[in-house]
Amino acid sequence: PVRPHVGVVMSQSITAPGAYDGIPETEYQSDALIGPPLARPMSYSSAKTILSHPARFAWERENRRPGKREFDMGSLVHALLLRSGDDRLHVVDAYNWRTKAAQESRDEAQEQGKIAVHRGMLRDAARVAAAARRDPRVTQILSDGRPEVSVYWVDEETGVTCRARIDWLNPTDVVDVKTVGSYSKADPKPFGRSAASFDYPMQAAVYTEGVERATGVRRGFATIAVELDPPHFVHVTRYPEWAVLAGEARWRRALAIYAEREKSGQWADEGITTTPVPEWYGYDEIDTPEIEV
């Protein structure tokens, strides 16, 4: 059975900091001004952008970020696996994008901010979700809890309002679902590299902090990584403590940058940077001093 948990409010509107069950995905993603102190909330995804390029963050905040079609399949699997629904999804009555009618329907839906999927994608996503649900670890994790819990809190140090959208919240864990596009990429080592590249440990730090602030309960963080390629292997994992601590430090730095830039109103790039060229570039072309042993 699934049931709401302590500190989670059943509501379709946000009125104050807390954890909410029932907020539509489009409302959460709208980033609308929802009244003090909840105006312009910061999220994990926003933190990633502001750490790398504050000006890009400022632009994306005022403009709809272009969608990536490779994410559409992930959103579909996510909705089917968690049985949560997603009001952004728009199913086109076709099994591919080859016909002009299907392409026009897709483009029209995307212009409206929808995620367009065809019936072939729906069939494939259902197979992925079914394979994941057959894994006993996934079955156990999803045996209790709620999908799509929206969490809002105010950071005490900076005064910045923060938000997170929890894929699945159960009594012991904050659970995140990741779809992996290639065969074997959900295995521990390759997934670990992806986790570092996409700042997943920061996500773990942000989500667990937000849930604790909103509900008063400290939970762990677990990730369900499922491969889109057959046979859809599943990897259930936790990030090491040191990585989550590093992610927390990155989150704190992002909040500080946000608070400073928001106060000054200065989002433009400053100065001239040095391109971080990988150390392996030109290694065989440059003479290096011999080291005496």
Regions found by a protein language model. Give the residues of each.
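Metal-dependent nuclease catalytic cores that hydrolyze phosphodiester bonds in DNA/RNA
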Residues: 3-164, 272
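Metal-dependent nuclease catalytic regions and adjoining charged, substrate-binding loops involved
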Residues: 9-12, 17-21, 194-201, 206-293
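Short histidine-centered catalytic/ligand-binding loop motif
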Residues: 64-66, 110-117, 186-198, 240-242
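A residue-level signal for conserved active-site and pocket-lining positions in enzyme catalytic cores
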Residues: 77-78, 168, 251
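Hydrophobic/aromatic-lined pockets within catalytic cores
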Residues: 81-85, 155, 179-182, 212-216, ...
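Secondary-structure boundary elements
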Residues: 137-143, 170-176, 211-219
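Coil-to-beta-strand transition motifs
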Residues: 159-163, 170-172, 218, 230-232
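Conserved catalytic cores of phosphodiester-cleaving nucleases, focusing on short active-site segments
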Residues: 164-193, 207
